[in-house]
Amino acid sequence: MKVIDLNCDMGESFGHYKIGCDEEVINYISSANIACGFHAGDPQVMDYTVKLARDNKVGVGAHPGFNDLQGFGRRKIHMTGEEIVNELIYQIGAIRSFCEANGVGLSHVKPHGALNNMASVDENLARAVAKAIKLTDPNLIYIALAGSKMEQIGREEGLKVAKEAFADRQYNPDGTLVSRQEAGAVLHDKETIIERVVQMASEGVVTAKDGTKLNINPDTICVHGDNPEAVELAASIRHMLQEHGITVKSLGTWFTG
């Protein structure tokens, strides 16, 4: 039986600002990556989102990013390895405390935005992220872009690394994600996205923008839930996976690394 995890970034509202359709998308995913207050989120949102995941039996993960609320963590910030380690320990610790307060276990860590993109190709950054996870809790699952420096370094550090693919993002031939600043970086056609996800989950393959077939064999696939159309898309993705005999389950219930 083929098993896959569907993850989604959540808890990215802040104060009076409402971002995402968390309450709707939660019905179709198996893991929630919850913002930790640096690129998005605040204590009230973090607590609410942990409860939302718990009540819907969805796995909870930390989604740490650069300290950049205005840029939503999508702008590059150059920091020392020590600074990265400490900022991630701080953020992971925050969401883990909310998990403990609500009787939930923290299952994984997935870096956000620019930090995720930079660490995917920068060995020193990737090692800093892995070190922060290892120092916080070496049993946490490290969600890393399939084929990236994060995956490589995470394994070298002895962490449980779950390979990630993105449902609605275009890929470069080297396996990195096409920059959001480029046209066509984010896919919008529903049928195309669903077809790609099924191919990822069943065959372990994704087609890059030049037609290259990339062997990624993902353990988890990221779906986005930041607009009403995304809710319908997430529902369709889950339904189609099940139609192809693929079971959707949170990483913490089956993944061993």
Swiss-Prot record:
The UniProt catalytic activity note for this protein reads: 5-oxo-L-proline + ATP + 2 H2O = L-glutamate + ADP + phosphate + H(+)
Q: What class of enzyme is it?
A: hydrolase
- Which GO MF term does the entry hold, naming one? 5-oxoprolinase (ATP-hydrolyzing) activity
* E.C. designation(s): 3.5.2.9
Q: Which gene encodes it?
A: pxpA
What family is this?
Answer: Belongs to the LamB/PxpA family.
Q: Which PANTHER family match?
A: 5-OXOPROLINASE SUBUNIT A, UNCHARACTERIZED PROTEIN YBGL-RELATED
Origin: domain of life: Bacteria
Q: Which organism is it from?
A: Natranaerobius thermophilus (strain ATCC BAA-1301 / DSM 18059 / JW/NM-WN-LF)
Instruction: Please identify the protein, giving its name as recorded.
Output: 5-oxoprolinase subunit A
